[in-house]
Each structure stands twice: as C-alpha cells, then as structure tokens.
C-alpha cells in the first residue's frame, strides 16, 4: 500500500529542510521516493500547512525495569484514576502503566524511547516490561561500573581486550543498545558503607578509582565500536559545587566521545548566601571546549514526581527530602543499586527554582542542538508528559518570563535567564529531538524523513502556543501505520527493541558461568533475555543495528 | 527416559536452577538438588488432561465457550488465585480489563503486610547474591527460614566462596521469635544459631523494644515479649557491629493481627542502623505460588500490586476492599475464575458462585466447579518467566515434558477472545 502525506511543511535537519513544502510517500512501513505519478497513492492524507517531522526520540527516560516498577508500587496514590473513558484497548485507562507510557509518548509524536538504566541481572525484567509498552520502539542501556566482575578484572589489571569482551558480552546478554555508567564504583562502595564517592575515590576492597572504571569502560565502548558513546551519570549528582565534577569528567574523557546525562543536576555552584548558585555558564564554557562531549539536560519542571536512580549514594543522601515521606533503597545482586525517592518540585522553593533556571540556562547557552539533548530525566526532573511545556519554554521568551515571575525571586535574581533572549526554532527542536538524537544513538533508520527511513512520522498543527502544538500531534505514523489522529490513539501495535550485538571472544561465557556458579548460584541461561513478548517472536521483537564509529557531532 | 540438567524451579521463590530431573514420559523425578518444596512439586503425578464442564469431560473449545458465557453474564467477576507465570498474568489482566473483574492473588493478605509497609514508609532491601557475598550477620524475625526455603543456608550462607568474607562459615545467624525447625542454620563447623524464642503474640513487643534499644532509648523493663532485655541487647549490638547485616522475615509466618506494623518496625530498624553509620539491609521472603510474578506484572500493567478491580473501567487498588474472601462472603461476586498452575491443593475459596478453575492437573474438588480446565505448570509443561523473591531477577522456566496441556495464557486468551 502506498500512502501519501500531501503538502506538509517538512522540518528534517538530515536534509537541511526547514519548512520545505513537500509530499512524503510511505510503502510497507518505510519512507520511499516520490513515485512517478502521484495518483498511484492508495491512501492520501492532506496535511497542507501542517508541520511534519520524523518521530521524536527520547534518549534518556526511565520507563521500565525493577526500580521503575518499585516506584509504581511505592506510590499508588500518585497515579490513582478517578474517571476514565475506556478506549476498548486493554489497559488504556491504567495510569503510569506500560500502556500509558506508550500512548502518551505517541500522542506527543515520540516513537522511540531509551530506558537508560538496565542492570544486566535485571535485563529480562526490563525487557518483559518494555515488550508491554505499545506503539513506541524502545532500547536499553546496560549498566556496568559497579559490578563485581568488572571491578575484579580491574583490580587484577587485565588487558583491555578482556574488558572489551565483557562489555560486548553484556550488550549481547542484555540485548541493549549502549553502555551506561552510573557514579562509577559508587553503588558498590555504598555497600561497603561509603556515603559519598568522587571521581578519584577508590572502591573499598578493590582499590580502583571511579575515574579508572569510567575511562576503561569508555575505551571499551570505543574499541568495540558502540555507536552511542558511553552514557555517563557523573559522581556528586545534585551537590552544590559539582560543576567541577562535571568539568573534571569532561577532561577525563581525554578527547574521546562521552555522553553526560541530565547535566542540569551538575550545573551547580556553591556561592551566594545559601551556598547554592548557578554554574551553567561555567559548565557550558567547558562544554564548548570539549567537542567530544554530548549532554542531555534533565530539566526540572514543577510537579509532584518521583526520583528513580541507580545512584544509591545520591538517593540515600536525599532520603530526608522524600515527599511523601517514604523511600526505597536497594542493593542489587553485587551489580548495582536502586534508590526511589518521591519528590515535589515547587516554584516557591529557592533550590527548585534555581534548578529550573539552571536547566534553561544550559539549554539556551549551549548553542549546539547537535550536542545538547532534550530530556527531563523522566521522571526525575519531571514526567515526560510535561515535555510540551518545556518545548514552549524553549521557543517562547515571553512565556519564560511569565513563568519566572512565579518563581522564588531570590533564585531569579541569581540567574542569567532573564537576559537570555534566544528562542528555539522548529528546526532546532527537530535537530535535538529527532535527527541528532538518532545519530547519537546510532539509529540510522530513523530521526529523518529520507527514503529508506522507518516511517515514524509526526504531523503537528502549528499554533502560537507551542505546548498545545506539541502536546497533541495531529497525526502520528509508526512504521507507516496511523496510530494517532487529532490527539487521540487510533491504533495499538507492538513496538520493537533496538539492539547492537558487538563481537566478542566466546571463551568469556565459560569463565562467566564459573564465576556465576561460584558467587551467584545462577546459570547464565536462567536469566538470559528471551521470549519476552506476549505477541511477538524474538525475531520480530529485536531490531539489530550496526556497530560503528561513536557519534561525534560534526554539524556544529 | 531423559535427564534434564540445570532446571529452574518456579516453586520455591528462590530461583533455584540447579535441579536435575529425570523425565520418563510424563512422569518426573528429581534426582539431584531437590528439597522438601521442589521435589514433591515437580514429582506431582500427571492426572486429568481434559477439561470438564459440569463434571463431564469435554474439549477445550467447549470449556472455553462455557467459561466465556459465565463471565459474559456476570456483573462482578473475580479472577483469583493468580498463581501462574508472566504470560499467564498478562492474559489474566487482559481478561480482567475486558470483563471488569477484580484481580486478587491468593497470598495477597500475607503480601499486604509487606506492601503496606512499602507504601507507608518504604524500606531498604537487598537480594540473594548480596546475602551470599556480603552478609556477616543474619537476623531472622519470626520465621522458620529452612521450611520456607530449605536450601537457603546451603546456597546463600554456608558457601565455599563469598566475595567479601574470608570465612563464610563464621557468619552469625540469630533467630528472634520462632526457633528453627531443623539444623540447617548450624554452620558446617558446628556453630549453632543463636535463638531468642518468643511466641507469635509476643513478637511485636520484642521487635519494638529491639528497635528502641538500637536507637539508644532507655528501657526500664527487664524483659519484652518474654525475652530478657539483656538478650535483646545482644541482638542489637551484633546487628550494629555487623559489616553488612541482613534482617529477614516471611510474612506468612507472622500470623498475628496487624503484622504490617511489626514489618514496618523491622524495616525501620534497618534504616536506623544505616542512619547510625553502618550497613544493614532487609530481605523480605516471598515468592511462592507466583506471588512476586503476579505483583510485578500487575505493577507494570496497572500501576498496582495484584489486588485490583477493573469494575469502574479503570484499575483501582484497595488492599482491603478487593479481598476476594470478603467480597465472596458479602455476596459481591457473581462468578469467579480461579487460576492455580502450581499447586493441586490450592483450591478456590468457595464455589457458591459459578466457578471456572484453571488448575494444575490432579486438582480434586469436593464440589465440582462449573468449568475445570487442567493447565500446564510453567517450568514443567511449558516455558515461561517467573520472578524470584528479591524482584531483581526474573528467571526463564523450561519445558520438561509434553503432556498436551495448554498454558494458562493460552486458555485465558481464548476465553478473553470469546467474551
């Protein structure tokens, strides 16, 4: 079947198209060249005047896995439903469910979302959950850096190729797309009773530093050709003065590609009456000097939310801020940790206001949407359902000023934001949330509208209120199927999971099994990721992407 | 006759995956690494494989059609038991969503003591490999650990190797409340566990005073819950001195009213010790009869643990209102589906309403249900996934034999389509 989207205004940075009026043709779920005769189309959608972009891609959003499910069960009161209209699709009225996650992303025109914290031992759980998220495609980033096996290798001082085999094996075993490092060594140190962990601190019992763990994993990611650079949650999250940690981590990258996650939480100085100040300018200054670094923001938005993180040191240190007053910390299988702390960001709060301001300062100062990505670290800075408001904040200076008037004014007085006049264009948004995001992840088949791309397409009705525009897409196509029409879900389908499968020396499996026999009483096969979907075979479920050179933004 | 190695068990909740099972046609024999829980559960003989409607043998399609008709005419169906694998729960929840049913896992009244604690104040917990590799002091509260998980000590405590313990046999085991039923807790070198015994109804007091001692509160009494304060001080000081202390309990063994308050006190003890600058973690023992699997799948599917009503057209969670026993007693349910793929002895609460049973082959009834469909057991008759007690690990179950039994998921999906 040939589908024609007629007369839309195309925003596709991959083709440098900014509002170009052109038709798009879809056949068998893929964007195709214009046929010789337009009359050949079987179905035609007249979208004259509407804004057309590739489906959006969220590079960092906690949507599945053990800690997310624990957060659901911890907080029944946060997602209670009262009135709901059934769509006659299963679970369409279940809030904060796998179904709602897929639906609400799709309604905004998002079609691919990355779960950035898959603990290898929990990968089967994460994939079982992701397989139940409808419509959108997903991918996971596998966490290493607190696991005994790696730290043991580092303590022994093995050759890099053994590390590389282990990283590659982990990506195979977990069916993930990339590598995540969370406060390298910190979760392990917490189990040995450390309560803080800096870049040059050593993990007790191993004598290896956070820096060494991080650099070794970064090198492994480069050498086994992971397209997505090592995805790093730095040390000292949320601590005043931690901009120095972020800058030191950029230096530690030694010119090789590295992605720094939710960097707003590291844009902190320790000046002023309260010992807490914005260091966005200093952070961005460092960012501009390190073209090998990409970052996502992790913007704070004002709402009740819950923070979910593998950085148990950071989470535990914030337990007294839990609102409501209940929280979970988990030591997980000598591999990692989890911390779940509910939190409410308030405009009246000096700290929360400043966090909000710092996030926006980072967005506006960075000047490079090819290297700086749009996230709220869902749900840690705010739920993804608030993205449309964040897009409006970026695109609409007057709206920003209106919002700033509601904030804690002591914080506003310390911020540059009122003097930053930049307004993001639709083209900037398309770079940040589509084209650059796909390239950063190594997903060549999406993030653009060129022939051959998966037909994941979002069509918006342009409005002055950008929150309204991006909150409810006019049409969304997933693999060429219409899934959203006029802001409503019209089709439920299965998504797929995106993976890379780098090569490794098979010998490692025997060594790992001996290790698991000794320390885990678990067979590797018992927790292998397989048969995860109710409706799809693994062959349909998992889409393999090529390994290759890690992302380095060349467009800036 | 074949032998299958490395068989994972869906029965014990501990994700034991080193069983060797001999398969002879449809009969199974555990020949290596069995235990009092797993061996009888695997060896349960196969019995009926054909569905029955009103006691008469029929085919699956007829049984499914009858089940669908019962659900169709019901105003408030109940889907109980919920003892199955991940796909079974997926299908069960889809059927509940479609029919507006109440979903209630059979062990929820026990699980509730943990869940209420989680939802009121949270907790700090750990997992089995952390216990194995770090735990130097284990405090067991009111629980006979070895009857719950017979191989717990062998697999996780009296181990040859542990990452952070030079000598795993020197771990300290302390029981408060229930004394152990056997000697699994005695170390291989002959060191017995310390046992501070009290009765069920004394346990809340003993645990509360233990917490007070850990917090350094002055205690004037000489004993609490029948245990001398000096003994409770011995427990407190060992837990505080532990490098990585673990406190464990099984809510099924806490058989007194408002056990959730004692669970909460235990969880607060763990937090207090961490507040005081050393490490301690909790280990809730759960996971029999697919309990953890049901709660996990229900969690990501509805947002709530496995006691949820779909009657209003959206999932609604209430840990008390949707207790199936209460609902049946109050006449609030007019049809039920009972799902129990693991245990032939776990039968529906009552058959006063039209009843459909998806049960393990061999389930016998005093009063025949309207529809009985024998289903395969996950991990024996079909592959599947189950969550281990500590939640982090999901394990893959194997198919060991072909007895022609459908899976829970297949049957429930067929019923859902027919409704």
How would you label these PLM feature ranges?
Chain A
Residues 53-59, 114-116, 261-262, 296, ...:
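Active-site neighborhood of phospho(di)ester-bond hydrolases with catalytic His/Asp-centered motifs
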Residues 1-27, 32-38, 65, 72-75, ...:
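Active-site microenvironment of metallo-dependent hydrolases
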Residues 158-183, 187-373:
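Histidine/acidic residue-rich metal-binding segments in metalloenzymes
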Residues 4, 43, 55-57, 230, ...:
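Residue-level marker for buried hydrophobic side chains located in beta-strands
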Residues 55-66, 229-237:
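Histidine-centered catalytic micro-motifs
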Residues 37-53:
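Active-site metal-binding motif and surrounding structural segment of the metallo-beta-lactamase
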Residues 64, 121-123, 147-150, 186-190, ...:
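Flexible loop/turn segments at secondary-structure boundaries
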Residues 69-139, 156-179, 208-223, 553-555:
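Alpha-helical scaffold segments that flank or form the walls of functional sites
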């Amino acid at each position: 079947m040939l589908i024609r989207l007629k007369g839309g205004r195309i925003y596709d940075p991959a083709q440098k198209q900014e509002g170009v009026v052109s038709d798009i043709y879809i056949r068998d779920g893929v964007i195709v060249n214009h046929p010789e005769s337009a009359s050949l189309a079987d179905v035609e959608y007249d979208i004259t005047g509407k804004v057309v972009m590739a489906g959006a891609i969220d590079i960092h959003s906690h949507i599945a896995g053990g800690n997310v499910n624990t957060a659901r069960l911890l907080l029944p009161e946060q997602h209670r439903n009262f009135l709901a209209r059934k769509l006659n699709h299963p679970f369409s009225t279940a809030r904060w469910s796998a179904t709602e996650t897929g639906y609400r992303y799709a309604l905004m025109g998002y079609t691919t979302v990355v779960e950035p914290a898959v603990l290898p031992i929990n990968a089967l759980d994460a994939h079982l959950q992701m397989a139940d998220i409808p419509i959108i495609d997903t991918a996971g980033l596998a966490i290493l850096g607190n696991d005994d096996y790696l730290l043991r290798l580092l303590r022994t001082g093995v050759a890099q190729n053994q590390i590389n085999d282990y990283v590659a094996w982990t990506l195979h075993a977990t069916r993930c797309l990339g590598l995540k490092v969370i406060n390298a060594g910190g979760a392990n140190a917490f189990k040995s009773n450390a309560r803080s962990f800096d870049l040059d601190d050593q993990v007790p019992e191993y004598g290896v530093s956070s820096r060494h763990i991080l650099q070794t994993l970064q090198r492994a990611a480069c050498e086994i050709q992971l397209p997505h650079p090592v995805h790093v949650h730095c040390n000292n999250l949320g601590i005043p003065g931690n901009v120095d940690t972020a800058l030191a981590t950029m230096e530690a990258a030694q010119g090789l590609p590295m992605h720094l996650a939710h960097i707003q939480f590291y844009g902190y100085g320790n000046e002023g009456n309260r010992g807490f100040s914005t260091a966005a300018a200093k952070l961005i200054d460092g960012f501009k000097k390190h073209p090998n670094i990409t970052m996502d923001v992790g913007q704070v938005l004002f709402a009740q939310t819950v923070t979910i993180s593998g950085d148990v040191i950071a989470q535990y240190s914030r337990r007294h801020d839990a609102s409501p007053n209940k929280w979970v910390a988990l030591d997980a299988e000598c591999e990692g940790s989890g911390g779940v702390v509910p939190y409410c960001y308030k405009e009246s709060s000096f700290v929360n206001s400043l966090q909000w301001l710092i996030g926006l300062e980072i967005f506006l100062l960075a000047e490079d949407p090819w290297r700086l990505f749009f996230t709220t670290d869902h749900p840690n800075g705010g739920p993804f359902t608030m993205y449309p408001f964040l897009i409006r904040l970026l695109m609409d200076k007057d709206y920003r000023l209106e919002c700033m008037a509601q904030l804690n004014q002591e914080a506003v007085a310390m911020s540059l934001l009122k003097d930053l006049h930049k307004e993001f264009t639709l083209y900037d948004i398309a770079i940040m949330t589509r084209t650059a995001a796909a390239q950063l992840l190594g997903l060549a088949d999406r993030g653009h509208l060129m022939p051959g791309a998966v037909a994941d397409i979002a069509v918006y009705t342009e409005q002055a209120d950008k929150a309204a525009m991006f909150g409810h897409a006019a049409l969304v196509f997933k693999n060429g199927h219409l899934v959203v029409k006029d802001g409503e879900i019209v089709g439920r389908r299965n998504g797929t999971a995106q993976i890379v499968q780098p090569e490794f020396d098979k010998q490692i499996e025997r060594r790992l099994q001996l290790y698991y026999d000794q320390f885990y009483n678990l067979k590797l096969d018992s927790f292998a990721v397989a048969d995860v979907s109710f409706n799809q075979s693994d062959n349909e479920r998992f889409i393999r992407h090529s390994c290759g050179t890690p992302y380095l933004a060349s467009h800036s | 006759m074949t032998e299958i190695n490395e068989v994972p068990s869906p029965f014990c909740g501990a994700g034991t995956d080193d069983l060797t099972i001999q398969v002879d046609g449809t009969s199974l024999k555990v020949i290596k690494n069995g235990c009092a829980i797993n061996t009888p559960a695997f060896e349960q003989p196969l019995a009926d494989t054909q569905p029955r409607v009103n006691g008469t043998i029929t085919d699956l399609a007829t049984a499914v059609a009858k089940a669908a008709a019962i659900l169709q005419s019901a105003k408030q169906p109940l889907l109980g038991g919920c003892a199955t694998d991940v796909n079974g729960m997926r299908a069960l929840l889809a059927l509940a969503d479609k029919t507006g049913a109440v979903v209630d896992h059979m062990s929820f009244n026990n699980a509730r003591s943990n869940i209420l604690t989680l939802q009121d104040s949270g907790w700090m917990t750990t997992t089995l490999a952390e216990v194995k590799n770090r735990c130097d002091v284990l405090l067991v509260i009111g629980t006979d650990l070895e009857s719950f998980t017979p191989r717990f000590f062998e697999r996780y405590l009296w181990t040859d190797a542990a990452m952070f313990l030079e000598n795993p046999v020197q771990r300290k085991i302390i029981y408060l409340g229930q004394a152990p039923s056997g000697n699994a807790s005695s170390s291989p070198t002959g060191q017995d566990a310390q046992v501070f015994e009290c009765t069920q109804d004394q346990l809340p007091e003993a645990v509360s005073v233990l917490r007070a001692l850990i917090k350094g509160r002055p205690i004037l009494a000489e004993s609490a819950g029948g245990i001398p304060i000096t003994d409770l001080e011995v427990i407190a000081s060992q837990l505080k001195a532990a490098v990585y202390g673990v406190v464990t309990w099984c809510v099924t063994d806490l058989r007194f009213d408002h056990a959730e308050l004692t669970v909460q006190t235990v969880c607060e003890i763990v937090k207090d010790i961490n507040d005081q600058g050393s490490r301690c973690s909790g280990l809730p023992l759960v996971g029999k009869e697919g309990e953890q699997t049901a709660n996990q799948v229900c969690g990501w599917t509805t947002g709530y643990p496995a006691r949820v009503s779909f009657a209003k057209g959206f999932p609604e969670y209430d840990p008390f209102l949707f207790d199936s026993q209460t609902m049946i007693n109050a006449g609030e349910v007019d049809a039920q589906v009972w799902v129990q793929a693991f245990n032939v002895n776990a039968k529906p609460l009552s058959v006063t309403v039209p009843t459909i049973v998806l049960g393990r082959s061999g389930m016998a009834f005093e009063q025949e249900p309207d529809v009985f469909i024998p289903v395969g057991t996950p991990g024996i008759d079909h592959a599947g996934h189950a969550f281990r007690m500590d939640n982090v690990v999901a394990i893959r179950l194997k198919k060991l034999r072909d007895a022609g039994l459908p899976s829970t998921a297949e049957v429930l999906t067929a019923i859902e389509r027919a409704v």
